[in-house]
Every structure is written in C-alpha cells, then in structure tokens.
Amino acid sequence: MAGANRVSDFSIHVAKENLKFSAAHFIAYPGFREPLHGHNYQVAIKVEGRLSTTGYVLDFGLVKKLTREIVERLDERTIIPAQSDCLTIHEIDSQVTVAYEGDRFVLPASGVALLPISHSSAEELARFIWTELHRELLHRNSLENVSAMEISVAEGPGQMAIYRQELFPG
C-alpha cells in the first residue's frame, strides 16, 4: 500500500484572499534599525495528517475561521516585538512608547500589536501565527489526525517565509 509507513498521507492547503493583514513594522537589532514601513501580508496554511472517520484531515472551515481571527488581531496595527533585545518598550495608559538608541516612537495602544517575538520578521510572524493556530486547534481537540502544520507569511508577491512543525499524532 502506498504510504503505509508514513504518518501523513493527506494534506490540506488554505490560501484565501481574506487571510491577509496590513501592518507596519521595522526590524531592529543592535546597531541596525530599518525605517518604519508596512506590508500587505498574505497568510497560507498547510496541514498534513491522516483522514478521520469523517473523511477530513481537518475541516477547512475551522482552519479559515481560526486563522482569520488571528490575522484580524494584526490588521492595521504596528507590530512591536515584545522580546526584542534592543528596543525599550513602555505601555502607559493608552500609549506604547518604543525607543531604539536615539529614536522614539509614541503610538496609540489600540494601534499596536505587541507580540511575544524577538523581531517582526516574516519568519517570526509565521511562527507566531502557527503557535496561535496550534493553541486554538489544541483547545478544540482538533489535532487528533494532524501530523504537521505549516504557515507561510508573504510580505508581497514572490517573497514569503514559512514555519513548519511536526506534531506526531497519537
């Protein structure tokens, strides 16, 4: 039988127009900071695994719904990496202040996505979205047949980062 020794024989791919977000960001590390700029990010998901008794690896509708909820939290925000080793970040009242060397940004808190990442790169955004989606699926006991998940985050046409992790279902 083809694939008899493999955990995953099927995969689903979700790449819908509404799985996008527009956000500002800048990359900063010691000795370097990009100018603040933005992207129209596009997110896609690949899920690998076995078929359930209902004929699904994972329901497309659930993947779309949960991913959409995640990207909505990032849409029209300035992404700030809360775990940065070179940014000083303060949240006071309704403002977020971000400082790097001599530069200082004061932003309305409602317009900031303060994320548990070190850099606001497409790579770390892909891992962040993967982690959030995995947490939501785990909470719903929806990972029984899933052996791997992959998230891609495109900053523009032909330019994307991918984060993939194996899950090894029971």
For every predicted segment, state its role.
Residues 2-170:
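Charge-rich, low-complexity N-terminal segments
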